[in-house]
Structure formats: structure tokens, C-alpha cells
Amino acid sequence: MRVGRIARIDTGRRARTGVPEVVLGEGKDDEHLVAILRALAEDGRGAVVSRPTRSQAQRLGGLARAATLPLESLAGGRVWWLRGMPDGDPPAGVVGLVTAGTADVPIAEEARAVLQSVGATTVEAYDVGVAGLHRVTRAARRLERSHPRVYLVFAGREGALPTVWAGLVRAPVVGVPTSVGYGRGGRGEAALNAMLQSCAPVAVVNIDAGVPAALFALHLLTGSSPDE
């Protein structure tokens, strides 16, 4: 779908890959973003808007309040959901979301919002970092009862939680380094490096990449059935 000279929207992404259309707000002109969303809405299609700027979020909020577009704010405004006609069944299986600290929760909630937009089921354990190992083991036992097919584990600072978590659970673990931390190795750098050097099997995405982590989890859910 073409939107003037500014965009070519992939309307077959969900059917082809199992993941929703995601429109990145960051770097786009506000009017261009709105034009893209209007075109999607007119065609009855949904989308996720990730990382809107402050002015974009204000604009989207105004459109939502006026009921001009079927928009919903998720994850504290870090993600917006343009609701459209159903274009597929909810993915089978559960995604576990785990954070080391409360400061990592906003990135985890970005991921949860993307998963929520397509009806995926999630279970969460927040603020269960390795500074209190009793919290980690207790949370792992609780979430394992839901039999997640993949875990997204978010951690800043030293980034140790994904490695520990991967040693406790059966499902694959995706480490998501967050930009929590300061000084040398801060802003997620030490966390990213630690996860890349994990001795336990952990896949790793970029710093603060909650949305890509969620999309990867959806690929795992839709790429095979739970019985395969």
C-alpha cells in the first residue's frame, strides 16, 4: 500500500511472517506518521506504533480522544496500537517476561504491548534480579508452571539475569539489555557484553530493543505448533 510519496506499507506482513506491522515513530515527521496511520485505518488494518516522540504522542492522544482514529496507548505511551480488523488467530503458547529491576519494566512493557496487540498470552515476573537469588528461583518456579515457549529477560547494569535464568528453565531465553546503569559500561553497554559472553545458551537483542524481542518471540510462537 502506497501512502503518497512517503511510504510503502507492507500489508501482508502478518499473514506472511506472523508478526504485526510496526511503524517506528522516531525520525518521522508528525504529519507523515499520521498519514500512514490514516491510510492503514481506512483500509481496516491495524499496526503498532513504536517509540513515538513527545509531539507525536500528543498528536496521537488527541486523535484517540476525538475518536478520529482507533488508537490506544500502551506501555505508558511508549507504544500505540492502531486497532484494525482481525487478520489472524492469536498465537498459541505463552511468552514469559522477566525483569531484573523495576527500572527495566518500561522496556518489558513495550514488548508486552506488542504481544498484546496480536492476542499473545504473557506471564510476568518483574524486579527479580540476581541481587536476591531467592527471588530468581521463586519466580522461575512460578512462571514455569505456565509452560512458556520463550522467555524475554530484561536487565541493565551487569546484565547477569538472563544467564542465570537460562540455567533454570527449559524454554529458550532472549536477553534484552536495557540502558539502566551509569559510569563505565553504563547505558546498557556492560549488560550487552555480559549477555553476549553468557555461558548458558542465551540469544541477545540490542539495548532497549523490547519491540524486536517481542517480534522474535512471535516468530517462535507462530513458526511451529506447541506439539512439534
What is each PLM-predicted segment?
Residues 1-70:
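Long amphipathic alpha-helical segments
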Residues 31-33, 104-109, 133-134, 155-165, ...:
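Short glycine/serine/threonine-rich phosphate/pyrophosphate-binding segments
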Residues 70-74, 165-188, 204:
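Short, acidic/small-residue loops that bind anionic groups at enzyme active sites
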Residues 79, 123-144, 189, 205:
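Glycine-rich oxoanion-binding loops at beta->alpha junctions
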Residues 90-135:
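Glycine-rich phosphate/diphosphate-binding loop of Rossmann-like nucleotide-binding domains
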Residues 99, 140-143, 180, 184-228:
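C-terminal binding/interaction regions
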Residues 138-178:
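Glycine-rich phosphate-binding loop
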